[in-house]
Amino acid sequence: MFHKELLKLYFICGTTTCQGKNLYTVVEEALKGGITLFQFREKGESALEGLEKLELAIQIKELCKKYNVPFIVNDDIDLAMEIDADGVHVGQDDIGVDEIRKLMPDKIIGLSIRNEEEFQQSKVEYVDYVGVGPVFDTQSKDDAGGAIGYEGLELMRKLLPQMPLVAIGGIQTKHIKDIIKTNMDGVSIISAISYAKNIEKTVREMSEQ
């Protein structure tokens, strides 16, 4: 069962977005700090594939389970189904959410929506939450598109008054209070957590915002 409280502090990471640190250790520190949701996002030039990717996903899924934090897979529906992940998150150019819902009737499904145009072409009735952004410019995602700012978040809340919404894109600890004022249910963080010197402490500070 999906609750919007899960979106409060949503950590997204893979081996290509943790500055060469051990991903398992990074996620463990973030879990100790109090992240509420984790997304395994294994993308980029040096991303793991095949068996390596599968084995790491299983390890991190089990780690998340220990902390009662749902484990979401980015884009890779086959992997999510193979390891019985708690859900998937997809973008506008991936497989349709209506198709995913048929394959994964009881799982969490998240969808990225940037603006009104994307909203109009999205089948939001099939998803549990929407990721909105990028709020600010970001280096973590090559395909993120232009920043939408706080105004973009406010617009998405008007378009989707009842939908659980999580902001993403270039978010630092100092932004969280203002983002929550736009009626977002939480924030998605990549590099501000994974690049932190003390991940556990950084996550605690974020969750206190």
Swiss-Prot record:
HAMAP family: TMP_synthase. GO terms for molecular function: magnesium ion binding; thiamine-phosphate diphosphorylase activity. One of its GO terms (cellular component) is cytoplasm. It comes from the Bacteria. Its cofactor is Mg(2+). It catalyses: 2-[(2R,5Z)-2-carboxy-4-methylthiazol-5(2H)-ylidene]ethyl phosphate + 4-amino-2-methyl-5-(diphosphooxymethyl)pyrimidine + 2 H(+) = thiamine phosphate + CO2 + diphosphate; 2-(2-carboxy-4-methylthiazol-5-yl)ethyl phosphate + 4-amino-2-methyl-5-(diphosphooxymethyl)pyrimidine + 2 H(+) = thiamine phosphate + CO2 + diphosphate; 4-methyl-5-(2-phosphooxyethyl)-thiazole + 4-amino-2-methyl-5-(diphosphooxymethyl)pyrimidine + H(+) = thiamine phosphate + diphosphate. Condenses 4-methyl-5-(beta-hydroxyethyl)thiazole monophosphate (THZ-P) and 2-methyl-4-amino-5-hydroxymethyl pyrimidine pyrophosphate (HMP-PP) to form thiamine monophosphate (TMP). NCBIfam families: thiE (TIGR00693). It is an enzyme of class 2 (transferase). Mg(2+) binds at residues 75, 94. Binds 1 Mg(2+) ion per subunit. 4-amino-2-methyl-5-(diphosphooxymethyl)pyrimidine binds at residues 39-43, 74, 112, 141. Coiled coil: none annotated. This is Thiamine-phosphate synthase 1. Keywords: Magnesium, Metal-binding, Thiamine biosynthesis, Transferase. The lineage of its organism: Bacteria, Bacillati, Bacillota, Bacilli, Lactobacillales.
